[in-house]
Amino acid sequence: MPHLTHFDTAGQAHMVDVGDKAVTHRVAVATGLIHMLPTTFALVRDGTAKKGDVLGIARIAAIQGAKRTSDLIPLCHPLALTKVAVDFELDEADRTVRCTVRAETHGQTGVEMEALTAVQVGLLTIYDMCKAVDRGMVIGDVRLMEKRGGKSGEWVAQ
């Protein structure tokens, strides 16, 4: 039976020791979306929101979120990220904006949490910048899509 690595035998939380792990190229891709009203979607799509370039600011916020992950997630190791790429895909029919983040490092632990945090921060920034016109936006479907590197190798969502 698998065990939770962030707890010792007494059930106390601790930061996992990654000191003996090999330095490898680590990659993680995460995604999520935000659903909004048609009028809100048009503001985002057209770049006419009162607060400015929603997607441009959300992109910077997502990158910053990846960089600050270890400050937000208590047992997450600080990483020297080598790449954070943020992509937004607009779906007019569903009135959604999908945020996809690819994070990379060369290190001893994976970048899944950085990619997931970046997606959430990017989507929260869209919410923040548009909440004056649409408080009913829904953030959802946030998930890890793939990870590569390290002892556990490659994993791709089904």
UniProtKB/Swiss-Prot annotation:
Binding locations of substrate: 75-77, 113-114
Keyword Cell wall biogenesis/degradation in record: no
Membrane-spanning intervals of the chain: none
Enzyme class: lyase
Family matches, as Gene3D superfamilies: Molybdopterin cofactor biosynthesis C (MoaC) domain
GO annotation (BP), single: Mo-molybdopterin cofactor biosynthetic process
Catalytic activity: (8S)-3',8-cyclo-7,8-dihydroguanosine 5'-triphosphate = cyclic pyranopterin phosphate + diphosphate
Domain of life: Bacteria
Keyword set, alphabetical order: Lyase, Molybdenum cofactor biosynthesis
InterPro entries xref list: MoaC, MoaC_bact/euk, MoaC_sf, MoCo_biosynth_MoaA/MoaC, Mopterin_CF_biosynth-C_dom
EC number assigned by the record: 4.6.1.17
A molecular function GO annotation: cyclic pyranopterin monophosphate synthase activity
Presence of keyword 4Fe-4S: no
Pathway of action: Cofactor biosynthesis; molybdopterin biosynthesis
Similarity section: Belongs to the MoaC family.
Subunit relationships: Homohexamer; trimer of dimers.
Role this protein plays: Catalyzes the conversion of (8S)-3',8-cyclo-7,8-dihydroguanosine 5'-triphosphate to cyclic pyranopterin monophosphate (cPMP).
Record's protein name: Cyclic pyranopterin monophosphate synthase
Protein's organism: Ralstonia nicotianae (strain ATCC BAA-1114 / GMI1000)
